[in-house]
Amino acid sequence: MAYPFQLGLQDATSPIMEELMNFHDHTLMIVFLISTLVLYIISLMLTTKLTHTSTMDAQEVETVWTILPAVILIMIALPSLRILYMMDEINNPVLTVKTMGHQWYWSYEYTDYEDLCFDSYMIPTNDLKPGELRLLEVDNRVVLPMELPIRMLISSEDVLHSWAVPSLGLKTDAIPGRLNQATVTSNRPGLFYGQCSEICGSNHSFMPIVLEMVPLKHFENWSTSMI
């Protein structure tokens, strides 16, 4: 869950988000080292009067500043490609949930059940109970089993939307006429909040997403009560 003046990412709840946080730290370290080197060179240029007016050809220097950036880019690209592959890979999901974006709410359908579907609207500020979060609470939460792979099929019925839950490392576009998919796996139970992350009209800010991850037994009891 995000909080005011937060500097870092939200706590990771899924294996994908853990990998994304590691990749973020890996890339940030490389950027920091490059920035330090550039600032050091600039400071030397500003503080020294020494110049190399006779240097017309420096084959070694050109070789270094050609090979070194290529190596750095490879160091960034390889872990990035690995994470992209992990995000697209779905192995034997135990559950499939179809998510449809509308102006301005979400609808969910549990395709493994016969009549388990509902719409999810934001709770207006005046109707919030003590402790509930403004612009983030919904009337119907998406209840899912934890520690199991779940496939989300995401689309839209009108305009472009984006289904995003930062704690799980999820952000998938909802495009009319196209079906995108994402894998949801939570390492722990709890409530995880997200919002539509694609500007979709005047009420774009009022399309929250709430996932309630519970043990499998609790999910079975919930699904039975909903049918």
Swiss-Prot record:
Q: Which UniProt keywords apply?
A: Copper, Electron transport, Magnesium, Membrane, Metal-binding, Mitochondrion, Mitochondrion inner membrane, Respiratory chain, Translocase, Transmembrane, Transmembrane helix, Transport
Please tell me where this protein is predominantly located: mitochondrion
Where is Mg(2+) annotated to bind? E198
What PROSITE patterns does UniProt report for this protein, alphabetically? COX2, COX2_CUA, COX2_TM
Give membrane topology per the record.
Answer: Multi-pass membrane protein
Q: Name one GO cellular component term.
A: respiratory chain complex IV
Which cofactor is essential here?
A: Cu cation
Q: Which residues lie on this side of the membrane: Mitochondrial matrix?
A: 46-59
| Subcellular location field | Mitochondrion inner membrane
Instruction: State how the cofactor is bound.
Output: Binds a dinuclear copper A center per subunit.
> Which residues of the sequence carry a binding annotation for Cu cation A1?
H161, C196, C200, M207
Question: Molecular function terms in GO for this entry?
Answer: copper ion binding; cytochrome-c oxidase activity
What does this chain do?
Component of the cytochrome c oxidase, the last enzyme in the mitochondrial electron transport chain which drives oxidative phosphorylation. The respiratory chain contains 3 multisubunit complexes succinate dehydrogenase (complex II, CII), ubiquinol-cytochrome c oxidoreductase (cytochrome b-c1 complex, complex III, CIII) and cytochrome c oxidase (complex IV, CIV), that cooperate to transfer electrons derived from NADH and succinate to molecular oxygen, creating an electrochemical gradient over the inner membrane that drives transmembrane transport and the ATP synthase.
* Protein known as: Cytochrome c oxidase subunit 2
